[in-house]
Curated annotation (Swiss-Prot):
Chain's role: Mediates visceral muscle contractile activity (myotropic activity).
Protein family according to the UniProt entry: Belongs to the periviscerokinin family.
Main localization, broad class: secreted
Residue numbers bearing the Valine amide modification: V12
CC annotations in GO: extracellular region
Compartments in which it is found: Secreted
Species in which this protein is naturally found: Panchlora viridis (Cockroach)
GO annotation, biological process: neuropeptide signaling pathway
InterPro entries per record: Periviscerokinin (IPR013231)
Designated name of the protein: Periviscerokinin-3b
Annotated keywords: Amidation, Neuropeptide, Secreted
């Protein structure tokens, strides 16, 4: 998720 949410995805 770009804006975040579950599991810390690469928010780049």
């Amino acid at each position: 998720g770009s804006s975040g949410g579950m599991i810390p995805f690469p928010r780049v």
